[in-house]
Amino acid sequence: MNDARAIAATLACFVLLLTFGCGGSGSKTNTNTNTIVTSGSNVQPITVGSGPTGNYTNGAFTSVTVCVPATTTCQTIDGVLVDTGSSGLRLLSSALTISLPQQKAGDGNPVVECLPFVSGYTWGPVQTADIQISGEKASAVPIQVMSDTDFPVPGACADRGSSEDTLSALGANGLLGVGNFAQDCGGACVATGAGNPELYYECPASGCVVTGESLAQQVQNPVALFATDNNGVILELPAVTGPEASISGSLIFGIGTQSNNGLSGATVYTVDSDGNFTTSYKSLPYNQSFLDSGSNGLYFLTSSASGIPVCPDAAFFYCPSSTQNLSATNQGANGASGQVSFSVASADNLFNEIGRAHV
């Protein structure tokens, strides 16, 4: 998923390194040629598959353990979507069985957040948890608990699209946002008044009102709070030549902090203040490109611009009559560039082969 913000967030020194391969329709034989790191205190297993709803397509899921801060009262939640397009842990209230402490504003009122994504919004209180993933731990982390019925959604939040606060809508029990930013908003949400993007609310009994939220109290990228291995992530998946029901990979914490997370000669594309870089396709530059494991496909251009027909029943997917082998060029804010090759096959055919709906 990608949080639909155009605000001045605080850019942290995080690196996202995604290593994987994919192809079009054809043989289901997995011809993996890259070696996946599977062991280490900083390695968390992930599965790309159908998720807890059984009908998600191309979702990278993992498990996360949350605890009441400074206690052994903990719960491990499966089916959490790994999302490099956002920052912060967000859990459905329906998946959470332990009671976490509520974050409060200076006047004692509960703090609640409305976070817009391209596909809709999440609404729910900010609570505090210790987070454990693989051998890593972050203490007293502000997280969002989505769809808590104690706090009715204000109109300004509901106007941002459809709610993603149910299992059927989200397709996951939560989101693990490990993107480029230390917080989910940054400096713009600290101040009150004009310029505040209206993400954070304090909610007295009379109703919720927009409030400023300090950087430390905002929903945090948990990776930034690990004691070590806290400067980025590697999302590592095997190469595949055709549709698969599921594949296994690893989420590796840290860049260059252990023997298993070096850059290994990878090209580094730095991003701008919004987390974007430039992708050029057919010599046309698109300067709002981003890496988003929370989206379940490669999203680029419109059918009229790409020349590829869309699916008759799902206009947001392409359905060419034969597999299209294409390429584009990525360029970072640092000027580094490189070509990426990819294939576009009929989404109808691919989904039919693995028994999925258009999700």
Q: Which residues fall in each region the model found?
A:
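Short hydrophobic beta-strand that contains or immediately precedes a catalytic carboxylate
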Residues: 79-83, 89-91, 175, 288-292
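C-terminal motif of bacterial Sec signal peptides marking the signal peptidase cleavage site
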Residues: 18-21
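Aspartyl protease catalytic core from the pepsin/retropepsin fold
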Residues: 60-71, 76, 120-182, 323-358
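Aspartyl protease catalytic domain
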Residues: 30-57, 140-286
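Bacterial N-terminal signal peptides that target proteins for export
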Residues: 1-11
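Primarily extracytoplasmic ectodomains and periplasmic/lumenal surface modules that are beta-strand-rich
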Residues: 71-73, 78, 85-89, 97-99, ...
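Bacterial signal peptide processing site
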Residues: 23-26
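C-terminal catalytic lobe of pepsin-like aspartyl proteases
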Residues: 96-134, 224-227, 231-358
